[in-house]
Amino acid sequence: LIAEAMTKAERKDPIYIAFDEYNVWYRAKGEEGNEEVYNLEDALVVSTFLNIFVRNAHVVKMANMAQLVNVIAPIFSTKEGSWYQTIFYPLQLFATHCHGTSLDTFVDCDTYALGGERIPYLDVSAAYDNEAGEVIVNVTNRHREQAITTDILCQTGRFGGKATVYEVNGPDIKAENSMTRQAVKTVTKEAQARGDRFTYAFPAH
């Protein structure tokens, strides 16, 4: 649509897309008590949003989460204290690690039916950080019951050895965080990635 509009307007300078507000919001209603309490399911939705932004980085140049503290936010704050909601963790990982150039990805995995389409269980984006010499692969396994073992292939180079895995997960998809319990959080693991491929089992959510 943008390309068509630019052609009709005889405009040569590019027009990009900005998401001024995005987040998960489907429970709280009314003028008061609007604070959403997020669960692991919501964190998976946020990670999918972020994957979409990275995959379309050639046209999406800005995306702002709404809000940052309270109401619909990754941080929940009260008079007694504050804590990280589940959606904080994918946002933190993308902000900390997903830098550089967005890479094109090809995903071949099992699918599920939704709205007349077949949707892959693995939602994937990737980026290359030229300064750090690192490839960042972001994967969301949307299967509720099965871990998905996957070969990750590099077509134009080779992996250099140790890989760090940051996994956001919890006891079940309805798990929530609170001031006294972080049921959903990031766990760090190590993996080996040598040659042009490595294999990893992405856990169910």
Task: Tell me the role of every PLM-derived stretch.
Residues 1-6, 48-50, 149-153, 165:
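Short, well-ordered amphipathic alpha-helices
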Residues 5-12, 58, 157-158:
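Short helix-capping segments at alpha-helix termini
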Residues 14-126, 131-133:
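Aromatic/acidic polysaccharide-binding cleft in carbohydrate-active enzymes
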Residues 24, 67-70, 141-145, 155-159, ...:
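Short, glycine-/Ser/Thr-/acidic-enriched flexible segments
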Residues 29-30, 75-76, 149-151, 174-179:
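Short conserved micro-motifs at the rims of enzyme active sites and ligand-binding pockets
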Residues 113-118, 144-146, 190-191:
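Extracellular beta-rich ligand/substrate-recognition surface
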Residues 119-159, 165, 205:
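Carbohydrate-binding surface patches
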Residues 158-198, 202:
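Acidic, Ser/Thr/Pro-rich beta/coil linker or hinge segments at domain junctions
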